[in-house]
Amino acid sequence: MSETLKLYFDYKSPFAYLAAEPAFALSERYAIEVRWIPFFLRIKGPSQRSQYSDWKAQYSYFDARRWANKRGGFAIKGPLKVYDSAPALIGGLYAQRAGFFRPYTEQVYARFFRRELEIDLPDQVAALISALGHSGDAYLAYARDEGPAALDACIEEAHADQIFGVPIFVFRGERFWGHDRMPLLEERLAEHGLARADTAASPAG
């Protein structure tokens, strides 16, 4: 029987983007179900940050691109503003309900970090959902009605799990922060006998 592995994510995080592809592959190698939980990452604007924070932000995107280059060089462009990712995160919850979460998530990350998608605009999220063959209007209705409360419930769960950033995996109460901690996570899954016998488990990278 599969165990549940929580993954807290935000579409505006380059490191959550780096974790996405290997996270989708985990269930192929381990007897787990990855439960993707949106988390609203609060980022200060330029006027609220210190010089040190600016340097850290610049380095973070440089480092994310360095990791992306090791995996074929997909685009990770820095954002032109601080984004309210709630419309896209609610879109993720809608996509989970409607059964197209993976293609939705892959497209949101890729388009956002190519600066081709404004994740704070519900109409653009709806257009993407329509392009994926699903109902953009149904998403907009969900975003007006049930979606905000569903996202709030995810944030409350994140607080209970002491989540402070993304990506964070939670396995049996143990947190693993960052895509570069995935090899440690995989070691823990293997220690608990969750590696699939028909698949050679290799560390994510």
Where do the protein language model's features map onto the residues?
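C-terminal cap of thioredoxin/glutaredoxin-like
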Residues: 4-6, 10-32, 107-205
